[in-house]
Amino acid sequence: YLKSHTFKLLEKVAEGLAEEMLVRIAGLQKVQIEIKKPWAPVGLPLKTVSVEIEREWHTAYIALGSNMGDSRSILEAAVQALDEIKNTKVEKVSTFITTPPYGVTDQPDFLNGCLKLSTLLYPEELLKELNRIEKEAGRERIIHWGPRTLDLDIIFYDDLVAETDALCIPHVEMHKRAFVLEPLHEIAPYKRHPVYGKTVREMLEDLRK
């Protein structure tokens, strides 16, 4: 790999090598790499400059929804598009189920599903890809809770708990939404919510009471 690629920065060498190993070596989940360059021209009296990084596969659960156009074809195309993201692979896909609209009820029923994927992307990078796929499917963000050709949401990302202006992980109020929990339960019944401490099965049972 290093013989066939040229880099100007040690960071890029380490990141590229880590990515190459994780993608090419079956079963490899995590790598830690340190690269040293002796007598690097950094303008400081140092004999060696080094960079150490750690990279790993992350597991994310994505909720899919559509209630405009040919929803089944749209969701199937979205699954394919997700699987084609660089350094990302879809592992499991739930059955697609028909559910009543949430929030704004004067609109067609939705077709919903969930999938599990492995990715080397960070959450913000993954969100950017989801937004791109939504846009390519014709998604327009006009009415909150309104009709949409495609809706893709990150429900879980490993056991990460994070909130920014752009995203919240785990997804806000996912524990109150049957259209998320039912397909998620099909593929990950024992996945535990990192904040509430309950499994998907337990959250779905609570919702049905």
Question: How should each PLM-predicted stretch be described?
Answer:
Residues 1-60:
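N-terminal, polar/charged subdomain of small-to-medium soluble alpha/beta proteins
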Residues 12-16, 20, 77-81, 125, ...:
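Long, highly charged amphipathic alpha-helices
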Residues 17, 67, 93, 183:
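Residue-level signal for inorganic ion chemistry
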Residues 29, 47-49, 86-92, 109-113, ...:
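A generic structural signal for short beta-strands and their flanking turns/coil linkers
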Residues 34-38, 96-98, 155-157:
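Short loop/turn motifs enriched for small/polar and acidic residues
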Residues 57, 102-109, 121-127, 131-209:
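Flexible, gly/pro- and Lys/Arg-enriched active-site loops
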Residues 58-79:
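Extended accessory regions or peripheral subdomains of proteins
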Residues 77, 81-122:
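Short, surface-exposed acidic-centric catalytic microdomains
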